[in-house]
Amino acid sequence: MALQDESLGIDQLSVDYDYLVYRISDRVKSLELEATRLVQRQNELVGQVSERVIDENIERFRGVLRGLDELEEYFAMMEQIGMITDSFKERLDSAMAALK
């Protein structure tokens, strides 16, 4: 029963990891697209700069920065998953050694 629980845990960890990688990839693409749009818009407005436009762009870039903060959290989650898998590998190696 414990082995089956461990197997389900590994499966869930794998699913969680894949989903996290997908979310990171999706978020990176989204942020890249938004940053590209902002830079293109900024270039278009170089000749027509106004304080209002600058403030709007600053707020949008702050949004991009918030998105990057989210990405940092995702990478921290990935690091935690790595630590969990390392710990599991050590326990598995220990269990295998005990069985020999």
Curated annotation (Swiss-Prot):
GO process annotations (BP): endosome organization; regulation of protein localization
Ranges in coiled-coil conformation: 25-46
InterPro entries the record matches: CNL1
Gene Ontology CC terms: BLOC-1 complex; endosome
Domain of life the protein comes from: Eukaryota
Keyword Glycosyltransferase attached: no
Compartment(s): Cytoplasm
Keywords: Coiled coil, Cytoplasm, Transport
Family, per entry: Belongs to the BLOC1S4 family.
Function: Component of the biogenesis of lysosome-related organelles complex-1 (BLOC-1), a complex that is involved in endosomal cargo sorting.
Subunit structure: Component of the biogenesis of lysosome-related organelles complex-1 (BLOC-1).
Name of the protein described by the UniProt record: Biogenesis of lysosome-related organelles complex 1 subunit CNL1
Organism: Candida glabrata (strain ATCC 2001 / BCRC 20586 / JCM 3761 / NBRC 0622 / NRRL Y-65 / CBS 138) (Yeast)
Taxonomic lineage: Eukaryota, Fungi, Dikarya, Ascomycota, Saccharomycotina
